[in-house]
Curated annotation (Swiss-Prot):
Cofactor remark: Binds 1 [4Fe-4S] cluster. The cluster is coordinated with 3 cysteines and an exchangeable S-adenosyl-L-methionine.
S-S bridge residues: 107-335
Binding-site residues, S-adenosyl-L-methionine: 161-162, 193, 216-218, 292
A single cellular component GO annotation: cytoplasm
Source organism of the structure: Finegoldia magna (strain ATCC 29328 / DSM 20472 / WAL 2508) (Peptostreptococcus magnus)
Coiled coil ranges: none
The protein's Enzyme Commission number: 2.1.1.192
One Gene Ontology biological process: tRNA methylation
UniProt keyword list: 4Fe-4S, Cytoplasm, Disulfide bond, Iron, Iron-sulfur, Metal-binding, Methyltransferase, rRNA processing, S-adenosyl-L-methionine, Transferase, tRNA processing
Protein name, entry field: Probable dual-specificity RNA methyltransferase RlmN
GO-annotated molecular function: 4 iron, 4 sulfur cluster binding; metal ion binding; rRNA (adenine(2503)-C2-)-methyltransferase activity; rRNA binding; tRNA (adenine(37)-C2)-methyltransferase activity; tRNA binding
Alphabetized PANTHER family for the sequence: 23S RRNA METHYLTRANSFERASE, RADICAL SAM CORE DOMAIN-CONTAINING PROTEIN
Note: Reaction proceeds by a ping-pong mechanism involving intermediate methylation of a conserved cysteine residue.
Subcellular location: Cytoplasm
Amino acid sequence: MQNKIILENMTVDELKEFFVNNGEKPFRALQYFQAIHKNRIFNPDEMTNFSNSLRGKLNQYNDIKNCSIIKRIDSKLDNTKKYLIEMSDGNIVETVFMQYKTHTSICLSTQIGCKMGCKFCASTKKSFVRNLQPYEMCAQIYLVENDLDIRINNIVLMGIGEPLDNYDNVSRFIDLITDKDGQDMSIRNITLSTCGLVDKIIRLANDDIGINITISLHNPFDNERNKLMPIGNKYSIEEILDACDYYFKKTKRRIGFEYTVIENVNDSKKYMDKLVSLLKNRNCLLNLITLNPIEEFNQKSPDRYKMTEFMEYMNKNNVNTTIRRKQGIDIDGACGQLRINNMTKRGVK
């Protein structure tokens, strides 16, 4: 008997091989792919264009993994909706839906937990469990779209986990979600956030995937950044910037930099001037983020006047800078917070 496989992780060409090897016509591959990624039919018994015999084969060989929404919280302040989604093995990830005037966006998790250990990020406060598979990333989108009866326009890989630490599965997910016969998401509407895995940034450039990337910078001085973000002990800021320059040269995609502003820690003129020296000659966008305080990181958020002062100083010095609009702050909107609270209530360490 053939070993169980996860057909939802397969491209159309891979599905063709599967169907032919099991005595079926190649065109069945496209039908199956569209059932999953276009029509949101996940149960082979509901694929009425397949014979009973073929449905039986799919049930026999396919290791069907169902994901489900276990909790949804709606913000009372904006149109943000925070989801807890349970994987087939019982692990839980966060997914955030955001509604804007011009588009919809979804923030996806790529791992269960995170290895990176950034001090101010709730995602790292419970142990790393495993990487998410491609179908589990797709499922976050499809479940939310079905729940809200909407079409999502933009994807940001900024949820729980470091996407480039799960490179193979994330790149496969991008292949699936951008396939014209499925979700047909524009590659230009996908943004990946990374803490700066230099080797993977270079690989991403060489693989010519063409998505947008944004770097979690948060401090312009290596010796201080290392204390906030342990990955800095492996890759210096200079190495990260060199990799970003290479990515821009290969893809022509403007690089984003994220900078969480922490009161009396990284918000003085000294830090602004250093950022200017690092970024002023680069085709980039600096995105200032107000710190979302968590219990394990006892620091304060700056007020809006300080944020505006920071932004104006950077723009005056030729660094294109914006302030990220805070979404869902009344529903533990920052990455990982809702999952942590849920795990704590259940006594999960």
